[in-house]
Curated annotation (Swiss-Prot):
Record gene name: MT-ND3
Matches recorded under PANTHER family: NADH-UBIQUINONE OXIDOREDUCTASE CHAIN 3
Chief place where the protein resides: mitochondrion
Protein name: NADH-ubiquinone oxidoreductase chain 3
Annotated function: Core subunit of the mitochondrial membrane respiratory chain NADH dehydrogenase (Complex I) that is believed to belong to the minimal assembly required for catalysis. Complex I functions in the transfer of electrons from NADH to the respiratory chain. The immediate electron acceptor for the enzyme is believed to be ubiquinone.
Lineage, top ranks: Eukaryota, Metazoa, Chordata, Craniata, Vertebrata
Highest taxon of the lineage: Eukaryota
Keywords annotated in UniProt: Electron transport, Membrane, Mitochondrion, NAD, Respiratory chain, Translocase, Transmembrane, Transmembrane helix, Transport, Ubiquinone
Pfam families: Oxidored_q4
Length: 115
């Protein structure tokens, strides 16, 4: 019986909220809202537009540092293992490896946006 009352009250509440939204919502369609938007590219234009290598490089660097964070996040729990010195050593090696890669990319000009 309690389950039935809960389901009924939930359905009534949802119906009231949806009805109020439909009655009070202001709609103002304009060409910008009605046109599809796909990451800054015109979806009705040519699908074979060249991709900037700069965006690609920034995406790859983002993935690398995202992976670094995913690897280093469990470090706080891993320090409490039997051999914390080994854990810290591996974390420093991973961090230095990625830092050297970032420095190399920076020195090669891969992070420069201006020509």
């Amino acid at each position: 019986m309690n389950l039935f009352i809960m389901l009924t009250m939930s359905s009534i509440t949802v119906s009231i909220v949806v009805a109020l939204n439909l009655l009070t919502a202001k709609t103002s369609p304009d060409p910008e809202k009605l046109s599809p938007y796909e990451c800054g590219f015109d979806p009705l234009g040519s699908a074979r537009l060249p991709l900037s290598i700069r965006f690609f490089m920034v995406g790859i660097l983002f993935l690398l540092f995202d992976l670094e964070i995913a690897i280093l996040l469990p470090l706080t729990w891993a320090i409490h293992t039997l051999n914390p010195l080994k854990t810290i050593t591996w974390a420093i090696i991973i961090f230095l490896f990625l830092f050297i890669g970032l420095a190399y990319e920076w020195l090669q000009g891969g992070l420069e946006w201006a020509e």
